[in-house]
Amino acid sequence: MNFPWDQLLVKGNWMITMAQIGAPFLVIGLIAVITYFKLWKYLYKEWFTSVDHKKIGLMYLICAVLMFVRGGIDALLLRTQLTIPDNTFLESNHYNEIFSTHGVIMIIFMAMPFVFGLWNVVVPLQIGARDVAFPVMNNISFWLFFVGMILFNLSFIIGGSPAAGWTNYAPLAGEFSPGPGVNYYLVAIQISGIGTLMTGINFFVTILRCKTPTMKFMQMPMFTVTTFITTLIVILAFPVFTVVLALMTFDRVFGTAFFTVADGGMPMLWANFFWVWGHPEVYIVILPAFGIYSEIIPTFARKRLFGHQSMVWATAGIAFLSFLVWVHHFFTMGNGALINSFFSISTMLIGVPTGVKLFNWLLTLYKGRITFESPMLFSLAFIPNFLLGGVTGVMLAMASADYQYHNTYFLVAHFHYTLVTGVVFACLAGLIFWYPKMMGYKLNEKLNAWCFWLFMIGFNVCFLPQFILGLDGMPRRLYTYMPSDGWWLLNVISTIGALLMAVGFLFLVVSIVYSHIKAPREATGDNWDGLGRTLEWSTASAIPPKYNFAITPDWNDYDTFVDMKEHGRHYLDNHNYKDIHMPNNTHTGVIMGIFMLLGGFFLIFETVIPAAICLVGILGSLVYQSFVQDHGYHIPASEVAENEARLREARIKEREAVGHES
């Protein structure tokens, strides 16, 4: 089968042409830098093939930040186009491509890897584990995500981006979208989604089987609890999306008719399958974000989390209801009054467990000795802003009223008030909060504060006017409008807000660079002035030792670590060290990733035979891995004792230095 060379290059747009010219230079420059500093061996042995959950988490976070930049640039392009009426900055199809990629990147390739990165770094440390349950699978999962990310971003310069929206509805995404654009969507998300499913299974088993034996479920830190419940959503929801992506791939590549009315298919089948996955997907990123807030708020309020058990049950209730609300995304598609009523009520019910969480956070703050570090600022700003998103969500849940709001900018404002305040604020707060645990030093708090205030104010300036625009009738997915529509002023204000958000994010980037150069290094591990309340703060900072814990810690209550510090105890007071078994690195993830990248690329351009050859390579890699007799290695007890003695001495010196300064 011949390769469609005529579809390879995208023509006719100056931005794409610049990217096509610049991308090769960027890649060549990156390769040159790595080669000049002789980093290939180091990167391959210490990072690319690593099964250390902390390093894999950092790789996820780096990718997530890069995708935040890409998705943010997309958003600025959209806002620039809509700033003035009859704007010709973007033509219609390019606008459609950008808003399609913006949604996919922010949800699939920014929010999810951000969450997975924090899972990898924090969860095993919070439960007293030495690694995840399946370290090799963890490495493979990352490379599947990475390949999906690369393929999806490749569409901008090779073949053309998808232009059917992030929901990719049939039949628009079928016979009305020729070319490779939609194929990029289907294949890239399919590959990444398989990695996501593997991650969900891995962390589900990790929390069940690898936690310290004395830790009971109701005593787990809330971030771990929300992670565990989220993994259940991943395990139940992602197979649905995997199937529906495969069905549309078969429609487009092999000529089947699952979603084509003329041949007996049903376009609404896609909408139902998509949202059976799509709404739980919202909670796949929201629930861990709630867990992040539940760690930060008690830390800087210096109080135990109020209503810990009710928070656990509320999280479980939200997860259960998330599978019963998908039809609210298409109330206007003629479902009938009975069906709309059921899904309207189930949607409103989600407000009950969510309200429980909000009140628990507020009661945690009540009479707390609150300090306003930047993670706390993001957490406090989340509460009123997310509440506005929730209230407007209840408005949209009323099926009859939804006929007025549906597909207007009111809806756009609503889901940004839930996802940006619920997820993006949490990601930024979590990154700053656990940054010293990952890197051994805190980010500059003054620069972080600038980031917060500009980002939070810019967010409200950007999206509050969009509620009014929606009520005034401005449709979503609109690439231009006329002066007579009267939407110009509010769109200008909205664009100014988007620019403020971008400047705020730049302050975070400056903070990362500045702190890397100037910030003092810390060894105690309990980096926020000794306020840490969970086990990860008991270990060394800057990627703790590969084994995490020299001995298995005891955990008898939700606030065990706080009690230990108050009584002057440490989990290492017992010096009965033993040899520690650890897993070896793996090449399988990198090899599978290469086959996935090539096979996915050929499938996108419907070149089936090379894609099939790559599939054989993928299956061969898995078969080979299944026969590998790798029993790992042991860290001798003497080495553990020496390492822990060195860390203990560093902690003592650091505490003495702090004492002299105070």
UniProtKB/Swiss-Prot annotation:
Pathway: Energy metabolism; oxidative phosphorylation. Cu cation binds at H279, Y283, H328, H329. It is found in: Cell membrane. Its EC number is 1.10.3.-. Its main location: membrane. Its cofactor is Cu cation; ferriheme a. It is a multi-pass membrane protein. Keywords: Cell membrane, Copper, Electron transport, Heme, Hydrogen ion transport, Ion transport, Iron, Membrane, Metal-binding, Oxidoreductase, Respiratory chain, Transmembrane, Transmembrane helix, Transport. GO terms for biological process: electron transport coupled proton transport; oxidative phosphorylation; respiratory electron transport chain. GO terms for cellular component: plasma membrane. This is Probable quinol oxidase subunit 1. The lineage of its organism: Bacteria, Bacillati, Bacillota, Bacilli, Bacillales. The gene is qoxB.
